[in-house]
Design a protein with these regions (language model features):
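Short loop/turn motifs at secondary-structure junctions
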Residues: 89-91, 186, 233, 318
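Glycine-rich phosphate/pyrophosphate-binding loop regions near the starts of catalytic domains
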Residues: 16-177
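Short, acidic Gly/Pro/Ser/Thr-rich loop/turn segments
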Residues: 7, 43-45, 57-60, 155-158, ...
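Hydrophobic face of alpha-helices
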Residues: 11, 110-113, 184
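N-terminal amphipathic/basic leader segments beginning at the initiator methionine
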Residues: 1-25
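A generic alpha-helix surface/boundary motif
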Residues: 76, 185, 269-270
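Short, acidic (Asp/Glu-rich) active-site segment that either coordinates a divalent metal cofactor
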Residues: 54, 145, 158-210, 246
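Glycine-/charge-enriched secondary-structure boundary and capping motifs
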Residues: 1, 16, 108-126, 139-146, ...
């Protein structure tokens, strides 16, 4: 059966983490049937629009379980959530999480929530509530999965997206911290299943163990990109997740424009070339699966690129101009293309 007492102990251990994310608009505390967020915060907007996003972390959770390291996977979850929200210009207000597990281990669950709370604090949003569901018989005792949702708001006439993008705009790449939370099924197949590598294997090219590299937390860009939008004119942003750089970039362009990304403007981190070489993965396949070192792309007037790079550098993010937007040849042409070859470090 379900261990009610273990669930209660897990809630007790996560309360301090949740409290650390509290925004002034949050009403009440943890443990009620619903979380409350004071909607009068919408009063500061002329025409408020709510934005919401739901996501998970895919099979990266299998690495966390194998390594018995559980706080980073919660951080990953929030990165996947709030950075899908910020690309439309929305400020994330709160996150709710869902953890399904075979058996409630209070320490493990509290560590997952610790990571969620840390990323919420980084993004400036509250962890408003969540659910921990014990599923004995469906999941093994050590197994769990995490998912969540986030809600925020944006001024109607400040929504970013295809309607703002113009011919002649420049593309600003913002570096990823590594794989982030996409492509782990491919990575696990290539390096663990096929090559027979172990997570405790020290990999010289990486300068650390394989497991440490694979658990590198997803970058949470939200507060930094919102700061950028407040200082520099931005037309659209693309969160590079499942599907890779070209596919995600095409989603934020109008039908009559194409984004051309120049690979020679950056060198992917060693983990990307390692997966490609060890697995003999083709360039199209690797680029359609992994972010290749770019976590975000900002579409903006070329005149503002230098200022944007400076703003992001001041916030600890590496960024560079990686391409441009031009007229699309026809409806059958792709919305984004990658050209040239990556420079070698």
């Amino acid at each position: 059966g379900v261990d009610i007492e273990a669930g209660e102990r897990a809630v007790d251990r996560m309360k301090a983490h949740v409290a650390a994310t509290r925004r002034p608009e949050v009403l009440g505390g943890l443990g009620g049937f619903a979380g409350f967020f004071d909607a009068s915060a919408l009063g500061k907007y002329r025409h408020p629009v709510l934005a919401t996003s739901t996501d998970g972390v895919g099979t990266k959770v299998a690495i966390a379980q194998a390594m018995d390291v559980h706080d980073t996977i919660g951080f990953d979850l929030v990165g996947m959530l709030v950075d899908d929200l910020v690309v439309v210009g929305a400020e994330p207000w709160f996150v709710t999480d869902y953890i399904a597990c075979g058996r409630v281990d209070p320490n493990r669950i509290a560590n997952v929530v610790k990571g969620i709370a840390a990323a919420c604090a980084k993004a400036g949003c509250s962890l408003l509530g969540g659910e921990t569901a014990e599923h004995p018989g469906l999941l093994a005792p050590e197994e769990y999965d995490v998912a969540g949702a986030t809600t925020g708001a944006v001024e109607y006439d400040e929504i970013l997206g295809p309607q703002r993008v113009q011919e002649g705009d420049a593309l600003l790449a913002v570096a990823s911290s590594g794989l982030h939370s996409n492509g782990y099924s491919l990575v696990r197949k290539v390096l663990l299943a096929d090559a027979g590598w172990t997570l405790d294997r020290h990999v010289d090219e990486l300068g650390r163990t394989l497991g440490e590299e694979l658990l590198e937390p997803t970058t949470v860009y939200a507060s930094d990109l919102l700061a950028l939008v407040r200082q520099v004119e931005v037309h659209a942003m693309s969160h590079v997740t499942g599907g890779g750089l070209a596919n995600n970039l095409a989603r934020v362009l109008p039908d009559d424009l194409v984004a051309t990304v120049d690979r020679s403007t950056w060198t992917p981190a060693p983990i990307f070339t390692l997966v490609q070489q060890v697995g003999d993965v083709s360039q199209p396949d690797i680029e359609a699966t992994l972010n290749m070192g770019v976590g975000m792309v900002v579409v903006m007037p070329e005149a503002n690129i230098s200022e944007a790079i400076e703003v992001l550098a001041g916030r600890g993010l590496s960024a560079w101009q990686c391409g441009h937007v031009s007229r699309r040849g026809g409806p059958d042409e792709p919305g984004a293309v990658l050209v040239s070859s990556h420079s070698r470090s």
